[in-house]
């Protein structure tokens, strides 16, 4: 019997319930189909060593994450929840992942590890609030580079940094280089460095929280605030469609910003004010407040509970405490719910029926557009198993004509799932002829049609000639027979008569006009004229 090869991708699909639970802990939502697509088709194209079957290597995951988080049009905001979940699986592997995770390298001798202090806390697993606990550092304190907290912050990406202090010794420099190399192999710097102001240490190897957030602990143990940069806001606004034009894409962008940047309440207001219009923002806030749930888990309209969970005025939350961070987590979750609900247009099935497959559009891309139309113009979730029949029928009827006709003729169509229909449509799509083949086929069809038309014309001409020949033959035969009969009949009607012989009764002594045997009609007979002979 053959053996089935287990890969990281197949392993996650076998334990999909655990994957969704881990994603939920990260405050994100993942879908199985897109999980497979990104792992097997998208991430291998980044050329960072990601295999089609997936991997739990932290270095490769970090490189893919840097490409996904790339700001501007080169980023992939829709893939953020998936790579964050992959990273969570690799950093804190469940029992079924541990056999596939390579052991972490032991620390170098030159970097001794100190035992954790009594106040050390494990890093937070949540992806929607900042980790405010400073990490224990074994390296000696570095000379201060930035001015004190009262002075202005300097953007090291756009301005020249201030001069450093005394140069360290060669041995210290070598130790620092080795430590930096070891750290960069595990987790490269975040691509969104424009979010930070000043110099920061690279993240630790076992940290799962992004370091690009407004609130983080400075080197002196004081909480520092790092606001959004104007370039980030400008790029996000100009490189993405408006919320009214494409709410799904802008919602995915804001979701990725909430995960990677860990914004505060003020940052959220700045983000909404930049990316949304006034009317759109009010609609989002209203939908978010409708999503607030009471203690019984059902939506509530009590003003005190709604204002406590999603305040419209600046709250006095202390982000250094667990309670304050929990408030911020809930606020971001409600904000995402408001964006998703506000992005839904009024129910309009005509819009859904108007989504048809393009001439060169793949069935998978068409299905994604169709599902997006269901989410936007109907209250139904296309991922709901109860709606699979409706989505399948729309997929068949609104596919390209050649694909739709073949899908309708499938045997046992009622038992086919949506995935089966997509696979059949992909087969039909891939077997389509190329433009050159289509032109050649059309040319051959035209030539064959012309050849058939010429053959039919020749056949009709031959039939016409045969018919004309038959008619002429009949006519000639009739003429010949008539002439023959005329010749034969003339000899009988005109016998040789004597000069005084009657042509009617053949008697001599009178002519036919005076023949007494010839009937005269109602008129009386004419007086007979006697003929005088030479003897008289």
From Swiss-Prot:
Official protein name in the record: Gag polyprotein
Species of provenance: Xenotropic MuLV-related virus (isolate VP62) (XMRV)
GO terms (BP aspect): viral budding via host ESCRT complex
Molecular-function annotations in GO: RNA binding; zinc ion binding
PTM-bearing positions, type Phosphoserine: 190
Posttranslational mods: RNA-binding phosphoprotein p12 is phosphorylated on serine residues.
Keywords: Capsid protein, Coiled coil, Host cell membrane, Host endosome, Host membrane, Host-virus interaction, Lipoprotein, Membrane, Metal-binding, Myristate, Phosphoprotein, RNA-binding, Viral budding, Viral budding via the host ESCRT complexes, Viral nucleoprotein, Viral release from host cell, Virion, Zinc, Zinc-finger
Coiled coil: 436-476
Keyword set includes Membrane: yes
